[in-house]
Amino acid sequence: MGSGHYFWAILYFASLCSASLANNAKINFREKEKKVLDQILGAGKYDARIRPSGINGTDGPAIVRINLFVRSIMTISDIKMEYSVQLTFREQWTDERLKFDDIQGRLKYLTLTEANRVWMPDLFFSNEKEGHFHNIIMPNVYIRIFPNGSVLYSIRISLTLACPMNLKLYPLDRQICSLRMASYGWTTNDLVFLWKEGDPVQVVKNLHLPRFTLEKFLTDYCNSKTNTGEYSCLKVDLLFKREFSYYLIQIYIPCCMLVIVSWVSFWLDQGAVPARVSLGVTTLLTMATQTSGINASLPPVSYTKAIDVWTGVCLTFVFGALLEFALVNYASRSGSNKANMHKESMKKKRRDLEQASLDAASDLLDTDSNATFAMKPLVRHPGDPLALEKRLQCEVHMQAPKRPNCCKTWLSKFPTRQCSRSKRIDVISRITFPLVFALFNLVYWSTYLFREEEDE
């Protein structure tokens, strides 16, 4: 029994010793890590103002490899021609002065949170408008130094970048927004930026944008030459396709409905002046408001956009429907005036005919001096000049038939040949306006959709 207690006591003592040794080992390892940092970054041992040497210690330019991780794309503004992006930016280079002993593979890398302790490339974003670092809860930045002298710098930043847009096909367009990175002070003789080999740009999965779709991205080089030398530059082009469904629901369908509503006046009675005027003015004002709202969300440009063609033609159709009623009203009043004049002319002719009949009857009666009445002979001699004059008065002159008018012949094919000219205008408009609008849609969509495919 005593030997058993003795065994467990020894085992407990051994476990305490091993734990103490492990803690001491950890403390000693961190002490060694601190000692390594002091050895490579101590006072007088490293100068962050001097750039590292080239590959294999040569005097060539320092090579910095870049890669990006796009975390989110917040907004793409058409009116400001800019977009906002949040990304993790990484750059990696080799500094021979930072090599250290990895303690038999136990020390994989050293981590720094102060970037100013080592040399840093002077990279800047050339098309940046605004930008800021993230410091919640701690600054989102670190530097890793590897045993072979390789340095990895990583930081999370948010940028607002300029994105010049061509809006000729808006809203059936595609836009290319670039992100450009260049050296500010070091020329290509001292510093060269390269994309990291193998997947230099990554994008977060399930990236959703309200009005665009990120189709693809392309990496390229954009070195620039100035009076002070040639500077290394990298760029990534993000290709965005605009989501058309939003504009179909918000713009195209409402405009079509307004145009169709304006045609209702063609089916109203031409005498319903208040109804037709109010309908035409209301649709015209609504269409004008819709157009101004669309233009308010776009920058003023010197060229015609696809949406301008659509809204302009729709506004023309609505205005044309209002002018059609003005023409119908004028034709109706003109027809009424002509009818009244025709009635007055017929009344005058009837009165003249009655007066002529009375005069002819009075000529047939002749009164002598003794107030006795006698009938004049009803048949006169053929050579009698008075008989010839009466015969000429009774002659009816027929006009020669006019040549048929093709337009009148075409108009006569519509219902009610005897209907007024104003009614015919309404009947023609009921057919002409929809046909012309359908033809416009055919030309519009075939033109812009074909141009969109060409841009692909």
UniProtKB/Swiss-Prot annotation:
Residue intervals on the Cytoplasmic side: 269-273, 324-426
Annotated signal sequence range: 1-22
Pfam family, one: Neur_chan_LBD
One Gene Ontology term, aspect cellular component: membrane
Source superkingdom: Eukaryota
GO terms, molecular function: extracellularly glutamate-gated chloride channel activity; transmembrane signaling receptor activity
Membrane topology, record value: Multi-pass membrane protein
Disulfide bridge partners, by residue number: C163-C177, C222-C233
Regulation of its activity: Glutamate binding triggers a rapidly reversible current, while the anti-helmintic drug ivermectin triggers a permanently open channel configuration. Inhibited by picrotoxin.
SUPFAM superfamilies from the UniProt entry: Neurotransmitter-gated ion-channel transmembrane pore (SSF90112), Nicotinic receptor ligand binding domain-like (SSF63712)
Tissue: Expressed in the medulla layers (at protein level). Expressed in all major ON pathway medulla neurons (Mi1, Tm3, Mi4, and Mi9) and in OFF pathway neurons (Tm1, Tm2, Tm4, and Tm9).
Major localization listed first in the record, in broad terms: membrane
Hydrolase listed as a keyword: no
Consequence of gene loss (knockout): Viable but with locomotor deficits. Results in loss of light response in all neuronal layers part of the ON visual system. In Mi1 neurons, does not affect function of the ON visual response. RNAi-mediated knockdown in Mi1 or Tm3 neurons, does not affect function of the ON visual response.
Transmembrane region(s): 246-268, 274-295, 303-323, 427-450
GO biological process, one term: chloride transmembrane transport
Extracellular side: 23-245, 296-302, 451-456
Function summary: Glutamate-gated chloride channel subunit. Together with Gamma-aminobutyric acid receptor Rdl, plays an important role in the visual response by regulating the activity of ON/OFF-selective neurons.
Miscellaneous field: Channels desensitize rapidly in the continued presence of glutamate and are activated by the glutamate analog ibotenate. In Xenopus oocytes, avermectins and nodulisporic acid directly activate channel conductance.
Family: Belongs to the ligand-gated ion channel (TC 1.A.9) family. Glutamate-gated chloride channel (TC 1.A.9.4) subfamily.
Subunit structure: Pentamer. Homomultimer.
Protein name: Glutamate-gated chloride channel
Record lineage: Eukaryota, Metazoa, Ecdysozoa, Arthropoda, Hexapoda
